[in-house]
Amino acid sequence: MTQSAPEFIATADLVDIIGDNAQSCDTQFQNLGGATEFHGIITTVKCFQDNALLKSILSEDNPGGVLVIDGDASVHTALVGDIIAGLGKDHGWSGVIVNGAIRDSAVIGTMTFGCKALGTNPRKSTKTGSGERDVVVSIGGIDFIPGHYVYADSDGIIVTEAPIKQ
């Protein structure tokens, strides 16, 4: 028996449901993907101006997963471009949240794939494979914990321990 994916709940509605304890990200990300609402189980990666590890992660099948990428808020180089976003989409990921920059934003904006980032930069990142996977990353006053759940839309980002039912 296949379990269906949890229903998307708008982040503003989640705050109303959860109340004052809602884990809302303070960082103001831009919606740059074609899917402006996305959600899923969190996978994390910390990488500074190097995207080889995150490319490897997005090459893995993860239906409905969301990769949270902590690039230490650097917009000096892009961590995600159209090829890497396409890999994620093709492997079932619902989207990425990039604490850094992306490139190829016009193409990514046409994909049915969620992408929130601080901004854009056409400069490529290095590809040495440095970084850490499945570690707690703290962005915008909240912790993104691997295995927890994230909801993202045009109002912001909410993290919960598990999917919320309406």
Swiss-Prot record:
It holds the Pfam family RraA-like. InterPro entries: RraA, RraA/RraA-like, RraA/RraA-like_sf. Gene3D superfamilies: Ribonuclease E inhibitor RraA/RraA-like. Its cofactor is a divalent metal cation. Keywords: Lyase, Metal-binding. The keyword Oxidoreductase does not apply. It catalyses: 4-hydroxy-4-methyl-2-oxoglutarate = 2 pyruvate; oxaloacetate + H(+) = pyruvate + CO2. It is an enzyme of class 4 (lyase). Its EC number is 4.1.3.17, 4.1.1.112. Catalyzes the aldol cleavage of 4-hydroxy-4-methyl-2-oxoglutarate (HMG) into 2 molecules of pyruvate. Also contains a secondary oxaloacetate (OAA) decarboxylase activity due to the common pyruvate enolate transition state formed following C-C bond cleavage in the retro-aldol and decarboxylation reactions. Homotrimer. Belongs to the class II aldolase/RraA-like family. NCBIfam families: NOT-MenG, PRK09372.1. This is Putative 4-hydroxy-4-methyl-2-oxoglutarate aldolase.
